[in-house]
Each structure stands twice: as C-alpha cells, then as structure tokens.
Design a protein with these regions (language model features):
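N-terminal, polar/Ser/Thr-rich
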Residues: 1-39, 47, 65, 117-124, ...
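Extended, low-hydrophobicity, Ser/Thr/Pro/Gly-biased non-transmembrane segments
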Residues: 17, 102-204, 227, 370, ...
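Surface-exposed beta-strand/loop patches in extracellular or lumenal glycoproteins
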Residues: 43-61, 142, 151-155, 424, ...
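Aromatic/His-enriched, Gly/Pro-containing loop or helix-boundary segments
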Residues: 54, 73-91, 128-135, 276-295
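A surface-exposed beta-strand-loop module
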Residues: 55, 60-118, 139, 519-531
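Beta-strand-rich binding/interaction modules
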Residues: 63-70, 438-439, 449-538
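Hydrophobic alpha-helical and helix-loop surface patches within well-folded domains
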Residues: 178, 208-209, 213-482, 617, ...
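Long, ordered, helix-rich scaffold segments
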Residues: 463-466, 505-506, 524-858
Length: 858
C-alpha cells in the first residue's frame, strides 16, 4: 500500500496522462477559533490524454463526503483509500472532478496549521505545503509538474484577514473570493488567515508598482521593524530584476511572519511565510539581522527560480534551493548600498560548514540526488541540497564568468516561464552563453558524492624564493555505507599570498587564479617570488573543497589568525581549523587555544558567534573525557573575561553574555547569572532583556538552581508563545529523574504537543552536563523510535528521531546499540538515514576524543 507516499514512476505516469487546467477551492474556516475540522470543496478541471484511463488524486482528510467525476457520483468507500481517490474511466480531453471533504487543522506545521496566541487567545492559521501537504487542505495532484491556476474562496470569522497568492479582495459577508493565480505548482499555493497585524507599502520602478505587505500577530506588532524589512525587500527587487532581466512575475508580494514554523521560510508565490522568531523581541547582534535579510532575499529569489520556473521532479530540488541560496548571498555582497557586503564571509563561515559536515556523513549523496519518492525528498532538505549546491554554483560562476552566468539565467527564465524544467535546460542555456561544455563539469560536480582536499606542496631555494608551488588534490574515501566512488574534480580556485606588514597585519600581496585538474596542478609563479608568510589555497572561496595549510603557513596562522585585514581569509582559516578538529587532525585542546589566541581580534560578529558554538561542541563532544571538565572551565573563564572586557552595549558583549550563559558552571559563575537575572548585579551596557533572561533561566534550571515554581514565575513575566517555549525547555532541562521522565513522556508517549513545544522540550532534555542522568534513555530511545516514526507526521517524527538520539553518549556501546537496532528494526530508508547520520556523529566524536587524548600524552 502506498500510504501517503508517491513514487517518481507514479508521478511520471500521471504527468504523461494529465494536463491540469484549474482548481476552484472553497474552504469554510468559520469555526477555526474552536479548531477540529473544516469543510473543503475542490473542483478541478483537467485533460486526459487517453479515453478510459485511470489515475488518482491525492487527499489527506479525516472524512470524504462526496466525489463526483464528470457529473457522476462515485462511491466514496470504494474510491478513497490510502490518502488517494481513484479516478477511473476518464474521458479523452476535458474532465471535471468535485471532492467534498472535512480536512483537519494541524499543530505540526504541515498542511493548515492552527495556533492560538496566549496573549489574545485568538487563533491564527497558515499553510505549509512543501513537499506534499496541499493534499491536507484540498484534493490535489500533488507533484510539481502538474501546474494549474488556483482560485480560492474562503469563509472566515468576522474581523479576520485572509491572504493568499492572489491580491486580497474585499470580503462580502466574511467570504473572501480571490482571483485565479497564474499557473503554479500545488506546493507553492498558500492561505494565511487570522486577525493579523499588517503594514503595507509598494515597490516602484519605471512605472512598475508591486504592492508589498508585512504581517505578524498583534502581540508582536510593537517589535515589527517593517522599514528594515521593506528596505531589504526593495534591494532584492532592484538587484534580482536587473540580473534576471525578467519582471517580478506575480501581482503582489506579501511576507507573513507566522508562529510555530518548522523551517526558516517558504516561497509561496506572492505570499511568503517566515518564522516569526525573525521579529526580534529583544536585542540581537547584527549577525541575526544579516540572517533574516538572507532569508528574505532567498525567498524573493525563489519567485523566479522555483515559482516562475519550477523543477519537473524533486531530484532537482537542489537547483531550487542552491540557486536561491547563491542569489541571496550574491545580492547581499554586490547590491549597491548593501549593509552586508561581507556576506561571502558569512557563507564560508556558516553555510559551507554545514555542507562539509553533511558531505562526510554516510548519507552523503550527489548534489543531484536520486529521489525515488516523497520519503526520499523529505529528508533531503540538507546541507548538500542548499549549501554545497550553492558553493558549486559559485564555482560554476567562476568557471563560466559572472556576466555569462546571468545572461544564461535570463534566457532560461524567458524560455520556461510558468513551466517546468530539468537541470539540462539550465546547463544548456549556460553552455550557449559561456561557450563552455558543461557536461563533464556536471558529471564531476553534480552526479558524484564527497569532498576533495586541496594541499599546497611548496619548494624554495636557498634565497627564500619559491621554485615551485603545486596544488595536490585528494579524493578521500567516502564514509562507510555511502554510495559512489571518490572523485577528483576540476576546481577553479585562487591562490592567495599573504605577508605581515609593518603593523603586524596579514595582507594579501599576490593572487593567482587557475584551473586545478587531476592530482597535481602546478601554479604559474612570477619570477623571483619570495616565499610568502601564508599560502592560502581557495582564496576568495571560489570552490568547494577542504583546504589544508603547509607547515610554515599553519605556524604563522596559528600565531596571527586574527591579524588578516580581510574577514574572508580569516573565515577560511577558522573553517580549516574547525574541519581539522572534527577530523582529529587538530586536538580539541589545541583548537581551544587557537580560538582563545585569535578571537579577541575577530571583528566579524557572525564568525565570533560560530566560534562560540564550535568551541562548546568541540569541548563537549571531541575532548578526551578526562580533560573535558578542565577544557570547559578554561572556556567558561574566557567567556566571562571577554564579557567583562567587551565594549558596553556592543554586539560582542551580547554574544559573550550568551556564550557565558551557555556554559557557566562553578558556584561563583552561577551566582553571577542569578545576580544578573535578579538585577542585584549589573555589567555596564548589558541589557538583561527578555531573551537574555531566558538564556540565564535555562542555564540555572539545568544546574538545579531554579525549581518549577521559579520557572513558572519567569513565565508569568513573559506570558507569550515564546515564553511558553522557553519555560518548557527550562522545565525539561532540570537535572532530576522526574523532570526527564516528564519531558520524555510528553514527547514520546504522547502526541499532544505542537511542533514548537515538542522542539523546545527536546532541546531542554538533552543537556551535555547530564550524561549520566540521560544514560537510561538510550535503551528507551531504540525501543520507541520506530513506533514513533510510523505513528507521527514526518516533521514531528524527525524532531524525535534526531533530537532524542543518544548523541551525548559517546561510546562504542552506543554504536553497538545503534547497529543492533538498524539490523533488527529494519527501518525505512528515511529513518535509517537519520539514525545512521546520528551514529556517524558518535563515531566521529570517538575518533576526535582519541586524537585529543593522544595529544595530551605526546
């Protein structure tokens, strides 16, 4: 039985048979305040290529009342099964189907999500349909290449606003009748409804006027910095329309900040939904504003790449996400007046770290993954699909040229507007504009898995001049269990030479760009080139590879990493050091010392915050267990020293306060947290606002210094959805058997928690200082996880499978327990992948711990 799955072969056959014309969808949401179910009436008109053919339409609904095909009533009990409605005896040419059903509101962030704000006790609704969840709201042919027009008619409670892909009409008797959309895929249709707060503006250029809207719940309205959001949006419109040479393809552009959102945002055509944590209630660093801007630009880029032109099947999901990721960073880097021209530093520091991690898991896969069915795609929103793909697009731009790249993209949009494509369509357009044959490039980069390592091999003469510089390329074996073979790839890279100037700064003195092919590539050198202090391969981060430094360069970088005048080479060196730590080539204790020696000079706040996270992870997971507490003590003392030394009111001060709160451990340190929380002690310039208070509360709760009553009192100060999440995490973090048992039961033994609260409880439950307390839950996890996977929706089950895996129990016993479960449980491919990825993390941590222990005895 197919259940809720859909195979590629089924989708191909349905696309061969059908051409879908239009949907008319009538939804009665008048009872949304109470919840439960709602009436959904779908009328869909489509053509069949054959007379008498048979197919199906998708629907996930508690009850189906009527199914009528070409005027004939079908027996519901016979045709509705396994989330499908069987459609037999189709006419050649035009057909019309009408389905009347009761669909369910959800609390999982899939389908039509319903949330009640504790501040005003009003219900707020929004849809999330990618990948296969439009069928939870209306009967649909749920695949991206069966595009159609969509006309929504919605009955809603009085006083509500309803937003969809088309411009919002004036309601008549609380009924909102929208105009049909252009031809789009089911997964980018949308409906958002509730008493939302709205701010409106326009984007205007050369006679073009695009209405803009920003929405959030009224309880967040005081924090909504609409002017900043509109400014980023207009920057995106300006840059994308110029680079794509195609006007914005929809009638308006709304951005809706919605609660309990599982992802960062979703590119619904003209009605983008964004997690409302991006409406900042408290002070955040500029890095948070940069991430929000990147999210806004990412979704806006999708209006062209993904919505206007859409992949035929989910194996090209990477192209959607990689292009939007590349475009978001490029816009921030190159748009006139951008606030974040250093965005490629952020990309190297965060997105590529994600990609490198993902690419070294047993689940590594080619960028163009083999997506056999919906189960495959649901676990494929990963670091390869987004970050590696975007890195490779950046490499492609370096390979064909920026102007040639965008000229090809322009031709691609014009040729395929409102249609569906495959990768070959884009590559063909780029081949025409660049003159490059991209077939071999595509095979090496898009159809193989794994990551290359680039090392310099340097020879000098007695006078200190370079006599040769060779780039040595390696293709390490793929992780155990991964499919494919190691592959050497063509790389377009820059080699940077850096020297110390008279003021002790590392400045670039030369840059050589070249194509790297095969195992060894000689770098052409100017005559009499002195050996530079640092030779940096992949300078400017043009390619996707792990980079290693030669011994002399590593020695200089270890002493002067913070002295690079530019942020990108610093980020590349930081990334290399982190990668070496994860690989066991650099001991955790040495990585800690490297960070402590250079972080004070790091001006990029995003890099600083990444280093905070990486050091904490390294000492928690990669340090030899007998040294771990000493390492944590050294790190915590450093965080407090930097907090006290930071400029009052600065981003760095806030970042160090959060780093200190994440790891405070001694009685004196915890007393300081308590005093800062109570206001009996202050640090000049540090505003202990709502979100920082919760960071302190969670650490104090995890340390056993706040009880249930005190957590409840903090929640009374912040009776909001965010406060509810923080309180749930704090309760689960308490170091008692009772707290852990209650948290476990609420997530694993009950399915009542909404997605966001479940996520919070899981994050509170898994405290790295509580390994012994959590040890009994290893056995409980393996006893429960398959049943959870089978019973819950994908999002909820994935949270549990990943979040509650015993990753903190770094031991051979955990590996053995995992292997035994994989052998006996016979999980489906998606669950097997998630558990295998977590197992790989434990295996890596064991190797890193051994390397750290060996360094101590060396």
């Amino acid at each position: 039985m197919p259940g809720t799955n859909l195979t590629r072969e089924e989708a191909q056959e349905r696309a061969r048979l059908l051409t879908v014309d239009a949907y008319e969808i009538d939804l009665d949401l008048s009872g949304a305040q109470e919840g439960g179910t709602y009436r959904s009436v779908t009328t869909v008109r489509f053509d069949s290529a054959e007379d008498g053919a048979e197919t199906f339409i998708d629907l996930v609904a508690p009850a189906v009342h009527d199914v009528e095909l070409n005027g004939k009533a079908l027996d519901v009990a016979s045709v509705f099964r396994d989330s499908r409605i069987a459609l037999k005896h189709l006419r050649a040419g035009a057909n019309e189907l009408k389905v009347v059903a009761d669909c369910a509101y959800t609390n999982t962030g899939e389908g039509l999500h319903r949330f009640v704000d504790p501040v005003d006790e009003q219900a707020y609704l929004y849809t999330q349909f990618e990948v296969p969840d439009a069928r939870r709201v209306f009967a649909s042919f749920e695949q991206p290449d069966l595009k159609a027009t969509f006309r929504f008619t919605v009955k809603a409670p009085a006083g509500w606003t309803v937003i969809s892909n088309s411009p919002t009409p004036e309601p008549v008797d609380d009924v909102w009748s929208f105009e049909p959309t252009p031809r789009i895929s089911t997964y980018i249709t949308a409906l958002i409804a509730g008493p939302y707060h709205a701010v409106h503006s326009t984007y205007e250029k050369d006679g073009q006027v695009v209405p803009l809207g920003i929405y959030c719940r009224p309880s967040l309205a005081e924090y909504l910095d609409a002017d900043d959001i509109f400014a980023v949006t207009r920057q995106g419109f300006e840059w994308f329309q110029e680079k794509f040479d195609y006007p914005y393809p929809f009638a308006k552009y709304d951005q809706l900040f919605v609660p309990e959102f599982n992802a960062g945002a979703m590119e619904n055509a003209g009605a983008v939904t964004i997690r409302d944590q991006y409406v900042f209630r408290s002070k955040v660093t500029d890095a948070s504003y940069e991430v929000r801007a990147a999210t806004i630009l990412h979704e806006l880029a999708h209006m062209w790449f993904g919505d206007l032109v859409t992949m035929e099947w989910w194996n090209d999901l990477w192209l959607n996400e990689s292009f939007a990721t590349f475009a978001e960073v490029a816009c921030q880097a190159y748009a006139e007046g951008s606030r974040w021209p250093h965005s490629w530093t952020t990309f190297a520091n965060s997105m590529k770290t994600w990609a490198y991690r993902q690419d070294q898991l047993p689940s590594t896969h080619p960028i163009m993954a083999d997506i056999r069915d919906l189960d495959d795609v649901l676990v494929n929103f990963d670091g390869i699909t987004y970050a590696k793909g975007a890195s490779v697009l950046k490499q492609l731009v370096a390979y064909v040229g920026m102007d040639e790249f965008f000229t090809g993209v322009q031709a691609y949009f014009k040729a395929h507007a409102y249609g569906n494509t495959r990768l070959a369509d884009l590559l063909g357009a780029l081949e025409k504009t660049s003159g490059r044959d991209l077939k071999a490039w595509s095979k090496a980069w898009l159809e193989t898995a794994g990551i290359n390592v680039l090392r310099p091999e340097i020879e000098t003469d007695g006078a200190g001049h370079l006599t040769s510089l060779t780039v040595v390329q390696e293709a390490p074996a793929l992780p155990a269990g991964a499919k494919g073979e190691p592959t050497l790839r063509p790389h377009r890279i820059a080699v940077g030479f850096y020297d110390l100037d008279g003021e002790g700064h590392l400045v670039r003195t030369n840059r050589i760009e070249l194509d790297v092919e095969g195992e060894r590539t000689a770098v052409p050198l100017p005559a009499d080139t002195a050996r530079p202090a640092v030779v940096l391969l992949n300078d400017d981060d043009l390619s996707y590879a792990k980079v290693r430094l030669d011994e002399d360069s590593l020695r200089v970088v270890t002493e002067h990493l913070g002295d690079f005048t530019e942020s990108l080479p610093r980020a590349l060196c930081w990334a290399s050091a982190w990668d070496m730590t994860r690989d066991g080539e650099l001991a955790t204790r040495d990585y800690l010392e490297l960070v402590l020696s250079g972080i004070a000079k790091e001006s990029d706040i995003g890099v600083v915050q990444s280093l905070h996270r990486q050091v904490k992870l390294a000492v928690d997971q990669y340090a030899a267990p007998e040294w771990r507490e000493a390492g944590l003590t050294r790190w915590t003392e450093a965080t407090l020293a930097h907090l006290r030394a930071a400029e009052p009111g600065s981003d760095h001060q806030l970042a160090w306060a959060r780093a200190f709160a994440a790891t405070a451990r001694t009685p004196l340190q915890l007393d300081l947290l308590q005093a800062l929380l109570n206001g009996t002690e202050e640090i000049e310039g540090l505003a202990v606002d709502t979100e920082l208070r919760w960071a302190f509360v969670q650490r104090l709760a995890a340390s056993g210094l706040l009880d249930e009553e005190e957590i409840a009192a903090e929640y009374e100060r912040d009776r909001t959805a965010a406060g509810e999440r923080h309180a749930a995490a704090a309760r689960a973090a308490q170091p008692s058997e009772a707290a852990k048992a209650e948290a476990w039961a609420s997530v694993v033994e009950s399915d009542k928690l909404p997605n966001s609260l479940q996520e919070s409880v899981i994050s509170g439950f898994t405290q790295s200082d509580q390994r012994e307390l959590l040890a009994p839950y290893t056995e409980k996890f393996f006893a429960a996880v398959k049943d959870v996977w089978d019973a819950r929706s994908h999002e909820m089950a994935q949270q549990i499978a990943v979040g509650l895996y015993p990753a903190l129990q770094v031991s051979q016993a955990t590996l053995d327990a995992t292997d035994a479960w994989l052998e006996s449980a016979r999980p489906n491919a998606a669950l097997r992948r998630l558990i295998s990825e977590s197992r790989s993390g434990v295996e890596r941590a064991l190797r890193a711990q051994a390397a750290d222990a060996a360094a101590a005895s060396a």
